[in-house]
Amino acid sequence: MDIGALRGKPVVTRKKQWLCVEGGAHPDLDAECRKAFMLLFQKAGIANRPKVRVCHGRSKAFKTFCNLLDEGDCDVWLLVDSEEPIAAGHQIAVGHEGDPWAHVGTREGDRWQRPSGATHKQLQFMTVSMETWLISDRDALKKVFTKGLQEDKLPSPGPSLETRTKQDLQKALAAAVRDTPAERYDKGAHSFKILAHVSPAKLWRLPWAARFLAEMGAAPDRVSRPE
């Protein structure tokens, strides 16, 4: 029984919050994904953290997002790879918050139309992929690959990182980890382990990643500190 209700006080019921994420493949990997995002949210000082729903493929993630949106009893966001660099007209710029629905609406393989009632901020990108986020934090890479990382093989961790293609990122990672004990980057084995160590302040330098953290409610003092 709610004591506040007995005293005549208004009862505030907080909506459930869901983040539908592209990724995962099996129960163990799904658990790693949820843990990595929860750690990222904690480090970013996000108080009201959404529950992470691991949706595997991007099409399933979009469908899950639409279904939760239709139910109307929760706050929901969709986080997917942009897969490709975002066109200039849809990019984040001064005076323009970016147009993610235009990107997936015209992208071959998606052709997603913005669902009724969905806002621009409910669609978030790992631009162009999760590997962008991983490469942004050299220290996180070192914690997983331990030694032998060739940082000079990796692209600059600044804003231009979000303009690199998936092929560029994969090639750079392959070259950078060649002399580590793992010898190669394996998305299933490594990606969420690295993400668990990624610093929100490093992500804050990337416009689309910063947009995501801001929408999730990141604390400014946690993400804007120099590193």
Show where each model-derived region lies.
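Acidic, divalent-metal-binding catalytic cores of TOPRIM
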Residues: 1-227
